[in-house]
């Protein structure tokens, strides 16, 4: 679709991948995939796309790698902020296995950033994306009314914006 090759990672513990899953390993896996892509494509041809847990990884990669654009679907501000939403009375940042401070990477991203998020996301509250959008002045937040965590691809608004972005020079 739109003449793009799509390269994806199965993080350890997801899909058919095995092995230990840690935040640094996930960052390293993304960097390795980026290096492989750069061997074949120019930086101006690479779009870094992350979904859900992968949005923090994608943001970190985009903060240290040149690319054409960054697209994040159902992003979170940070895992700590997300955990505080669910367990607001506990010191969750001390207990968290991952932190993925997505917001901290946004200030270092030079490429255009587009966020896709549904207003009825039952996993990552929409307010996380809205807060994240404020971390970089050029962020475009595409709001999918009544969209949930795993159904944004069913929305015509999602496809219209995605297709328009993929056709940009």
Where would I find each of the regions flagged by the language model?
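Membrane-embedded segments
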Residues: 1-40, 53-56, 62
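Alpha/beta-hydrolase active-site loop signature
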Residues: 11-15, 77, 148
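Conserved alpha/beta-hydrolase "nucleophile elbow" surrounding the catalytic nucleophile
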Residues: 46-55, 118
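Hydrolase active-site cap/lid region
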Residues: 55-105, 111, 156
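Short alpha-helix in the alpha/beta-hydrolase fold that links the catalytic acid
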Residues: 102, 111, 125-134
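Short beta-strand/loop motif that positions the catalytic acidic residue
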Residues: 108-110, 115-121
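Acidic catalytic loop of the alpha/beta-hydrolase fold
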Residues: 119-124, 149-150
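Catalytic histidine-centered segment of alpha/beta-hydrolase-like enzymes
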Residues: 147-159
């Amino acid at each position: 679709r739109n003449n793009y090759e799509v390269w994806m990672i199965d993080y350890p513990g997801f899909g058919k991948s095995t092995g230990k899953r840690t935040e640094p390993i996930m960052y390293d896996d993304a960097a390795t995939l980026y290096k492989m892509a750069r061997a074949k494509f120019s930086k101006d041809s690479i779009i870094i796309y992350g979904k859900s847990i992968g949005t923090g990884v994608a943001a970190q990669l985009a903060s240290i790698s040149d690319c054409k654009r960054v697209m994040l679907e159902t992003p979170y501000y940070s895992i700590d902020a997300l955990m505080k939403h669910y367990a607001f009375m506990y010191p969750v940042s001390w207990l968290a296995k991952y932190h993925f401070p997505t917001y901290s990477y946004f200030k270092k991203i030079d490429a255009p950033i587009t966020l896709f998020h549904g207003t009825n996301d039952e996993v990552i509250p929409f307010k996380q994306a809205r807060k994240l959008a404020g971390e970089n002045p050029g962020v475009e937040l595409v709001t999918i009314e009544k969209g949930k965590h795993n159904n944004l691809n069913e929305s015509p608004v999602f496809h219209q914006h995605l297709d328009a972005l993929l056709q940009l020079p």
